[in-house]
């Protein structure tokens, strides 16, 4: 009886092109970025009242929202994607860290800070999976961060009792 050679199983090629979900997430990031910029424009009269920590938070979030569509829509695995990915990780990480300096009116952390903690735990895994070329896990973490750290957290910045919501809807 013949035996088969013991070769490791061939790695299945992963299609790295943006799929429907990534195109949708990138589009939603653009929509959210538009709402943030519109709120900022409408609240220009109050800009002088904002502490630096809020400006840092807004700047890093705007950078993250702006980079998201570019990264999700562009070809993957090249230097540009890698460089923009590191910039995205840095901006999102700084946003998450900075969020702990932003408190409720009573000085407490809010439930949304749980997303900041999850984000800070997920970012190292995102970088590690990219460096290991583990495309499936990397893609899963990216989607989770875009949905949770960007879109969900961003959505909850627009209720009327929050600054951006007040500026946009008043």
Enumerate the predicted regions with their spans:
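Alpha-helical membrane insertion/targeting regions
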Residues: 2-170
């Amino acid at each position: 009886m013949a035996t088969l050679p013991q070769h490791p199983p061939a790695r299945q090629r992963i299609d790295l092109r943006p799929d429907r979900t990534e195109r949708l997430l990138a589009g939603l990031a653009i929509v959210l970025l538009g709402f943030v910029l519109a709120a900022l424009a409408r609240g220009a009269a109050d800009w002088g009242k904002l502490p630096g920590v809020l400006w840092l938070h807004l700047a890093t979030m705007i950078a993250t929202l702006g980079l998201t569509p570019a990264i999700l829509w562009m070809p993957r695995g090249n230097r540009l994607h890698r460089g923009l990915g590191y910039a995205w990780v840095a901006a999102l990480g700084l946003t998450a860290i900075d969020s702990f300096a932003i408190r409720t009116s009573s000085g407490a952390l809010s439930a949304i800070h749980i997303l900041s903690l999850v984000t800070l735990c997920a970012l190292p895994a995102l970088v590690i999976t990219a460096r290991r070329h583990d495309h499936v896990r990397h893609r899963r973490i990216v989607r989770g961060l875009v949905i949770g750290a960007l879109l969900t957290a961003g959505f909850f910045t627009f209720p009327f009792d929050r600054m951006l919501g007040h500026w946009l809807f008043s």
